[in-house]
Structure formats: C-alpha cells, structure tokens
C-alpha cells in the first residue's frame, strides 16, 4: 500500500523531545503506537516487521522511543513504568492534537515493559485508546492500573517463555 506520510518525528513531552518513526498509508483512520521494552528502541526488527505488515494492511504506525538516549542508558528509567506510562499518554495526546489524526482510532502495541506502559496509558485514556496488544508483555508491572483498564486487550506470549506464561 502506498504511504502518504513516512517520516521521522520529534515529539515534545515535558522537558524532553522523544524520537519516533511515523508511517501513514493512504486512506486510513487507524494508528498503532508501538511501546517497546527496556533495552530496545524504535529500530527493533520485530516491531519494525509488525509495523510494516500493519502498514500494508492500511494502518498507520508510530514507533517511538519513550526515553531519550541518555535516559535509556540509565537502568532506573528503563524500568520506571509510571514514567513510561505518562510518556506514552503524552505521545497519544500529541497524535490526537495533530489535525490530520484527530479522528483516528488509536491502538497500542506494547512489548515487554512497553506492554505495562500500554496498559497504564489505557487505564488513563479509555476513550482515546481503543485496543492494546501485548507481545511478550509484563502486565504484572502495571498491577495497580489493571482494574481500571476498560480497553480490549490481547496478550500474546510464547509457550516457552517461563517469565511470561
């Protein structure tokens, strides 16, 4: 499917600028925001593959780093689910503030700790986030938020992943 927009974006969130990759096929009203896990980035081959497939199916994608380069080096920030949740919520608001995306349906694809932040953001924004997909996620890291999640959630785990299953 032909892409209408394919660009690197810089998203202001508080005192930092987050970097991401935005791909928008023609004639769509759906956006999937990717929240990757600790130790990964928007360049994750797995997430890029899933994003490419979603683009081919006519869905827009935003692969975003929820931490700056400096923050991702510090172990504490990589596992700060509250910070990651707030950043993901801010990124979601940023998308909805863009006139072209105002009426888009938003879903979150979270991997590992990114799934915990996706669930946290969904608990804060039930009317804005329409679905959450967790790939190898850690919903246990979002326990306080789980009772508040009203959004449909799909949990995908590997059968040999003892930490997850």
Q: How should these model regions be labeled?
A:
Residues 149, 155-157:
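Short beta-strand/loop motif that positions the catalytic acidic residue
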Residues 9-104:
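Serine-hydrolase catalytic machinery in alpha/beta-hydrolase-like enzymes
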Residues 160-164:
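Acidic catalytic loop of the alpha/beta-hydrolase fold
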Residues 107-110, 135:
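Short beta-strand immediately N-terminal to the catalytic nucleophile in serine-hydrolase-like folds
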Residues 94, 120-124:
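Active-site signature of alpha/beta-hydrolase-fold catalytic machinery across serine-
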Residues 2-9:
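Short, hydrophobic/aromatic-rich segments at coil-to-beta transitions
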Residues 127-139:
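A conserved short beta-strand
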Residues 110-118:
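Gly/Ala-rich beta-loop-alpha elbow adjacent to hydrolase catalytic centers
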